[in-house]
Amino acid sequence: MTYICKYKTPSEFSDILINSDGEYLTGLWFEHSRDTLKHMIDCEEKKLPIFKETIKWLDIYFSGKNPGFTPKYKINNLTPFRKEVIDIMNNIPFGETLTYNDISKLIAKKRGIKRMSAQAVGGAVGWNPICIIIPCHRVVGTNGSLTGYSGGIKNKVALLALEKNDMNKYFVPKRGTAL
């Protein structure tokens, strides 16, 4: 069974939907993101300890602070490549960013290969089922372009600003993905 709970965010953000298998956090999405409906099918609302823990994390985060803990989560269908990307995203400090290319270089170095596709990294970043907590919003284009966020570019900009990033380093392209 999949359980769901809704989190009311500050006004500059879309609200958030949280999924659980009853024990672990299994999904966290902005309510109006492109895949929202598929995460609401066959879900039951229920008060769960994992929802309480996740809401505590979100409350701290949306107050502009690094929560300092991570709710226990489980990701289904996690390939080794996706795990590498998620592990790197989990190590991007609060208030900092990496580029898709930075991540591809880290993976290539770890694997002992010359190159890794930044586009493949983008696919793995976009696949992330637990936004914010696994900070895919901290991954940006090489030139500072803010594209590729399934939660919507408005939310990505607001998340980076909340973390006190220097927003002069970034721009929203006129055309691109996830605008």
Identify the role of each PLM range.
Residues 116-158:
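Short glycine/serine-rich loop segments
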